[in-house]
């Protein structure tokens, strides 16, 4: 209901930021677990696509059974998939541009954190991993875990900057 009935002010921006962070964290956790499991059983990728609401998109792009690298490309890097991590980060950047200056701390800190995560995600070279399936699953799982931790740091930075009324003392 709030998506249709809420005015698009600052409260909306915070709600949208929370939604994007939550979707990114949950998706990254699912992808990380699936990548680890995929070393022994790639059947886990079909339910992963279902849970991330990306089955039809995958089928439209790939006329084959799901495999790790194309699934990772769709769920992590694809700008066209609105459920991908890259799309969540893109929408977060737009939200951050609309947020007020705040009352304390570094107003650009969450943007800097997000820029770092976007760079880290962009560094994933799936083509280089095609010949090394074990390394691919490890690299994807590790990257997803790191990105999820980074998203939690962004959430903490937003909370501290906009919702913390206590000031840190500099010693």
Language-model features: locations:
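Alpha-helical transmembrane segments and their helix-helix packing motifs
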Residues: 1-171
